[in-house]
Amino acid sequence: LITSSNATARMLKAYELAPEKFGDKVDYLGHERPNGIPDVLDEAKWGLDWMHKIHYGPDMLFHQVADDRDHLGMKWPDKDSSDYGWGANSYRVAYFATGEPQGLREYKSKATGIANLAGRSAAAMAIAARIWKNEFNDPVFAQKCENAALELYEMGKRQEGYQQGNSYGAPYRYNEDTWADDMEWGAAELYKNTGESGYLEDAKRYARMANTVSWTDKEDAEHYRYYPFINVGHFVLYEHVDRETKEELAGYYRAGIEHTLERGSKNAFKIGVPFIWCSNNLAVAITTQMILYEKMTGDTQYHDFMLAQRDWLLGRNPWVTSMFMNFPVEVEYPQDGQTSVWYL
């Protein structure tokens, strides 16, 4: 849920901001036939359906299925040798979001709550409620998402703090240790849906807690420490607040951008991210942050720097290789996304 909540919410927000950018070539199952729904929403609904499954009651939330016992080298998906105690290629464990340290062996997480998961899951559900209500005239699914958003947000308020990923025998995990940004995002989206002032006040309070906390001023960080690497909540809240608060929110974004601008001035490609594990995620995040900053303020002073980060990902790098499969067609790009299938 750490990653799926973010991926789902980001796809939904991208569609909401620019629906004209997304086409309809396949159906929900990926068959090459249009189904009247933009493909990005077909993909996002896989995330929503998964999130509904693991949040199957008002106070219920699972956050992880399986662990590093899956890390057994190259294997076919239908002949999985992973064994969780029920034999190979069988059942897997599911971890409930308790908000407390978890881990079945020596490498325990440092969890303190569940608000990171609950907050951004609430954001995803709130956006989905708007889209399925207004775009697809599906009040049943829209209400299901709205109810989930309200429930998840309340769960986050009751257990402020962060739930981390769990490992079994490996010393690494998803070390996310921030949560106020996620609750800000959830509160801002719910205010947009309900107009209830309590959500607006919550969002402003969480925004000031989240402030400028980010990877942007760090040269190193634990794996996934500042996930999801950008605070979308500042952007969503911006349109609902007074001039003074707008300046605060824009200032938070600007501070992070300035840190990366300084770092980028020290290399030929003007890349502003530290080259650590998941540095491409950071490049996407700071590019997105500058796009949202421009939308908020109209200030384009960082535009060329933003293009440099984007172009690095698209092939203007020492390898002349795109970091995306099948795009852009003019440069080399990865063609074997599933290493096991290619190897076997």
Spell out what each predicted region is.
Residues 1-6, 64-120, 124, 170, ...:
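Aromatic (Trp/Tyr) and acidic
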Residues 4-19, 41-54, 118-130, 148-156, ...:
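Extended, hydrophobic/aromatic-rich amphipathic alpha-helical segments that build helical scaffolds
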Residues 13-23, 107, 111:
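Conserved, well-structured interaction surfaces
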Residues 17, 21, 54-57, 131-138, ...:
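Alpha-solenoid helical repeat scaffolds
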Residues 29-40:
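Acidic, glycine-anchored loop motifs typical of Ca2+
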Residues 39-100, 134-175:
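Active-site acid/base region of carbohydrate-active enzymes
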Residues 43-58, 146-164, 197-219, 251-269, ...:
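Long, well-ordered core segments of solenoidal/helical folds
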Residues 165-176, 217-224, 268-277, 326:
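Acidic, Ser/Thr-rich low-complexity linear motifs
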